[in-house]
């Protein structure tokens, strides 16, 4: 056999030569501030309308039924009539859902059962 030289490998430990200046407290603060800034921008982009609604004063939305509170119901024969509507000056026939006048056999008796001898307002009927 030939004489083959033996090669021995020894582990080599190399110390890192870079300094750990990247991990200083000052650098971390900048990264944290940048992340917080990005988070605020994302919150603003995705929740802009919600933030505007939160900081704006709430508008009072008028109740559409408030205009009907002064209206009263009355009977003309067997026909139910409404008077006192703000946009109408005369007595008008009350209409059902299918836009036909409401005709009830004992109309006056029905109104007395709702509010006794007092005039029946539309508000009394809507609250029941």
Curated annotation (Swiss-Prot):
Assigned GO CC terms: membrane; viral envelope; virion membrane
Disulfide bridges in this chain: 75-107
PTM comment: Most cysteines are linked by disulfide bonds. They are created by the viral disulfide bond formation pathway, a poxvirus-specific redox pathway that operates on the cytoplasmic side of the MV membranes.
Induction data: Expressed in the late phase of the viral replicative cycle.
Family membership: Belongs to the orthopoxvirus OPG099 family.
Assembly and oligomerization: Interacts with OPG086/G3. Component of the entry fusion complex (EFC) composed of OPG053/F9, OPG076/O3, OPG086/G3, OPG094/G9, OPG095/L1, OPG099/L5, OPG107/H2, OPG143/A16, OPG104/J5, OPG147/A21 and OPG155/A28. Except for OPG095/L1 and OPG053/F9, each of the EFC proteins is required for assembly or stability of the complex.
Protein name (record): Entry-fusion complex protein OPG094
The organism of origin for this protein: Vaccinia virus (strain Western Reserve)
């Amino acid at each position: 056999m030939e004489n083959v030289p033996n090669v021995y490998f020894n582990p080599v430990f190399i110390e890192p030569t870079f300094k750990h200046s990247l991990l200083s407290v000052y650098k971390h603060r900048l990264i944290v501030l940048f992340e917080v800034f990005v988070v605020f921008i994302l919150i603003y982009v995705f929740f802009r309308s919600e933030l505007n609604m939160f900081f704006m004063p709430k508008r009072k939305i008028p109740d559409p039924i408030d205009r009907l509170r002064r209206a009263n119901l009355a009977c003309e024969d067997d026909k139910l009539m409404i008077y006192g509507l703000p946009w109408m000056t005369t007595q008008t026939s009350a209409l059902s859902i299918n836009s036909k006048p409401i005709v009830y056999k004992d109309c006056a008796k029905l109104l007395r059962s709702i509010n006794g001898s007092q005039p029946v307002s539309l508000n009394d009927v809507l609250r029941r």
